[in-house]
A protein has these predicted regions:
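Structured mid-to-C-terminal alpha-helical surface segments
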Residues: 1-113
Length: 113
Protein backbone atom coordinates (compact mmCIF):
# COMPACT_ATOMS: atom_id res chain seq x y z
CA UNK A 1 0.00 0.00 0.00
CA UNK A 2 1.24 3.47 -0.91
CA UNK A 3 0.42 6.56 1.16
CA UNK A 4 0.13 9.77 -0.84
CA UNK A 5 0.95 12.97 0.99
CA UNK A 6 0.43 16.50 -0.29
CA UNK A 7 3.49 18.72 -0.35
CA UNK A 8 3.83 21.61 2.12
CA UNK A 9 3.28 23.99 -0.79
CA UNK A 10 0.06 22.31 -1.81
CA UNK A 11 -1.21 22.25 1.79
CA UNK A 12 -0.52 26.00 2.09
CA UNK A 13 -2.46 26.76 -1.09
CA UNK A 14 -5.38 24.50 -0.10
CA UNK A 15 -5.67 26.20 3.29
CA UNK A 16 -5.53 29.67 1.74
CA UNK A 17 -8.10 28.53 -0.84
CA UNK A 18 -10.46 27.67 1.99
CA UNK A 19 -9.97 31.09 3.57
CA UNK A 20 -10.59 32.82 0.24
CA UNK A 21 -13.62 30.69 -0.54
CA UNK A 22 -15.38 31.31 2.78
CA UNK A 23 -13.96 34.77 3.42
CA UNK A 24 -15.18 36.47 6.57
CA UNK A 25 -17.57 33.57 7.18
CA UNK A 26 -14.76 31.05 7.68
CA UNK A 27 -14.60 28.98 10.84
CA UNK A 28 -11.23 27.45 9.97
CA UNK A 29 -9.18 29.52 12.39
CA UNK A 30 -6.55 26.84 12.99
CA UNK A 31 -5.70 26.98 9.28
CA UNK A 32 -4.24 30.45 9.81
CA UNK A 33 -1.78 29.05 12.35
CA UNK A 34 -1.05 26.02 10.15
CA UNK A 35 -0.19 28.30 7.21
CA UNK A 36 2.10 30.39 9.44
CA UNK A 37 3.85 27.24 10.64
CA UNK A 38 4.31 25.89 7.11
CA UNK A 39 5.67 29.12 5.62
CA UNK A 40 8.14 29.38 8.50
CA UNK A 41 10.08 26.45 7.06
CA UNK A 42 11.82 25.88 3.79
CA UNK A 43 9.29 25.79 0.98
CA UNK A 44 9.50 26.08 -2.77
CA UNK A 45 7.92 29.46 -3.50
CA UNK A 46 7.76 28.69 -7.22
CA UNK A 47 5.53 25.71 -6.44
CA UNK A 48 3.28 27.87 -4.29
CA UNK A 49 2.85 30.34 -7.17
CA UNK A 50 2.27 27.48 -9.62
CA UNK A 51 -0.48 26.01 -7.43
CA UNK A 52 -2.11 29.43 -7.05
CA UNK A 53 -2.08 29.82 -10.83
CA UNK A 54 -3.73 26.40 -11.23
CA UNK A 55 -6.30 26.57 -8.45
CA UNK A 56 -7.06 30.27 -7.97
CA UNK A 57 -5.90 32.66 -10.69
CA UNK A 58 -7.29 30.58 -13.54
CA UNK A 59 -10.51 29.78 -11.67
CA UNK A 60 -13.47 32.04 -12.44
CA UNK A 61 -14.93 31.29 -8.99
CA UNK A 62 -12.21 33.41 -7.38
CA UNK A 63 -11.80 37.18 -7.68
CA UNK A 64 -8.07 36.94 -6.96
CA UNK A 65 -5.97 37.00 -10.14
CA UNK A 66 -2.48 37.55 -8.67
CA UNK A 67 -0.58 37.38 -5.38
CA UNK A 68 -1.36 41.02 -4.54
CA UNK A 69 -5.06 40.18 -4.74
CA UNK A 70 -4.46 37.19 -2.46
CA UNK A 71 -2.62 39.27 0.15
CA UNK A 72 -5.27 42.02 -0.03
CA UNK A 73 -8.07 39.48 0.46
CA UNK A 74 -6.25 37.82 3.36
CA UNK A 75 -5.71 41.21 5.01
CA UNK A 76 -9.42 41.99 4.73
CA UNK A 77 -10.47 38.56 6.02
CA UNK A 78 -7.97 38.20 8.87
CA UNK A 79 -8.46 41.72 10.21
CA UNK A 80 -12.25 41.52 10.08
CA UNK A 81 -13.64 41.91 13.59
CA UNK A 82 -15.08 38.39 14.00
CA UNK A 83 -12.09 36.55 12.54
CA UNK A 84 -9.52 38.64 14.40
CA UNK A 85 -11.37 38.18 17.70
CA UNK A 86 -11.60 34.41 17.24
CA UNK A 87 -7.95 34.11 16.22
CA UNK A 88 -7.04 35.55 19.62
CA UNK A 89 -8.71 32.63 21.43
CA UNK A 90 -6.18 30.21 22.93
CA UNK A 91 -8.13 27.18 21.71
CA UNK A 92 -7.15 28.03 18.11
CA UNK A 93 -3.65 29.45 18.61
CA UNK A 94 -1.72 26.20 19.02
CA UNK A 95 1.53 28.08 18.35
CA UNK A 96 1.01 30.53 21.22
CA UNK A 97 2.36 33.38 19.08
CA UNK A 98 0.85 36.85 18.85
CA UNK A 99 -1.98 36.97 16.31
CA UNK A 100 -0.63 40.28 15.00
CA UNK A 101 2.77 38.68 14.32
CA UNK A 102 1.11 35.78 12.51
CA UNK A 103 -1.15 37.93 10.34
CA UNK A 104 1.69 40.27 9.40
CA UNK A 105 3.93 37.36 8.44
CA UNK A 106 1.21 35.78 6.29
CA UNK A 107 0.44 39.01 4.47
CA UNK A 108 4.14 39.83 4.01
CA UNK A 109 4.81 36.34 2.68
CA UNK A 110 2.10 36.51 0.03
CA UNK A 111 3.03 40.10 -0.90
CA UNK A 112 6.63 39.03 -1.43
CA UNK A 113 6.00 36.27 -3.97
Amino acid sequence: MKLLINSKEQIIVEKVLSLLRFGKQTTRYKDVFDIYYLISYSIDVKKVVKYFECYVFNNENFEEKNMKDVSDSLREILYSKRIYTNLKLKEYNWLNISVDVIIKKLINFFESI
